[in-house]
């Protein structure tokens, strides 16, 4: 069962970086559900002079999917959201943190108790690189200045220290980042994923299977039987898809090739 404790390795990593931050923390999150250790760390960081800024998602009614989001917003004076923009149905679905302009944490985990407790399965990556942090900072500054979704400028730079970084929608992450990796795979493609709906991804996975690549997926059960899911198409192409059916969510969005 999920709890409110910061018991997962993911939460502990985020907490450690909040506690060790010396000057700045910039966060772009989908939403928040209460994890007391995170709230305490944020309060302590601000008390020792760390400047914290927050960007979060709201819908067309200025609401957030998580009930504790606005409680979290009230802890942080410097907060902005994507409300009131022309793309009213678009979602600010980021989950990234920039610490002291030198460390970036990003991945599939929301700042929710179901993810922070380790109940749901997620992945994060911790990148200790000032140049990568600069790229994320540029994206953050656009949103903090009120540019969201289709209003954002294309990133001036998307490579640093061995990483390729694409922000949606402006950098065309699917076309420029994901599809080329699938097309160039020669041995295997392993994908743990919450849901797969994109026709172009399915087409390229089937093409990879046909050229002898070992393609395998693990999908969350919640979406597996929905009309928009492409699992059946993949299975008909002889691609094995395991559907996780335990109580929690397979919430990862990962491609290994």
Where are these regions (language model features)?
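HKD-type phospholipase D/PLD-like phosphodiesterase module
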Residues: 1-22, 31-183, 203-257
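Short alpha-helical functional segments enriched in proximate histidine and acidic residues
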Residues: 28, 192
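Long, repeat-rich segments with strong aromatic
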Residues: 194-196
């Amino acid at each position: 069962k999920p709890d409110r404790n910061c018991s997962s390795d993911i939460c502990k990593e985020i907490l450690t970086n909040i506690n060790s931050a010396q000057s700045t923390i910039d966060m772009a999150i989908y939403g928040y559900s209460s994890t007391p250790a995170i709230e305490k760390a944020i309060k302590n960081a601000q008390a020792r002079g760390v400047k914290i800024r927050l960007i979060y998602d709201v819908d067309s009614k200025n609401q957030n999917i998580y009930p504790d989001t606005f409680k979290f917003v009230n802890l942080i004076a410097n907060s902005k959201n994507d409300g009131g923009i022309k793309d009213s149905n678009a979602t600010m679905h980021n989950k990234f943190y920039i610490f002291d302009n030198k460390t970036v944490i990003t991945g599939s985990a929301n700042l929710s108790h179901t993810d922070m407790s380790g109940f749901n399965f997620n992945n994060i990556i911790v990148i200790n690189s000032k140049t990568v942090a600069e790229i994320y900072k540029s994206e953050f500054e656009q949103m903090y200045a009120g540019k969201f979704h289709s209003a954002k400028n294309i990133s001036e730079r998307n490579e640093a220290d061995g990483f390729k970084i694409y922000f949606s929608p402006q950098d065309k992450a699917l076309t420029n980042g994901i599809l080329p990796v699938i097309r160039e795979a020669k041995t295997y493609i392993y994908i743990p994923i919450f849901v797969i709906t994109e026709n172009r991804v399915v087409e390229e996975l089937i093409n990879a299977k046909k050229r002898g690549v070992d393609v395998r997926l693990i999908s969350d059960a919640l979406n597996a039987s929905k009309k928009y899911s492409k699992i059946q198409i993949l299975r008909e192409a002889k691609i094995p898809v395991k559907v996780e059916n335990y109580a929690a969510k397979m919430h990862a969005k990962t491609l290994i090739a």
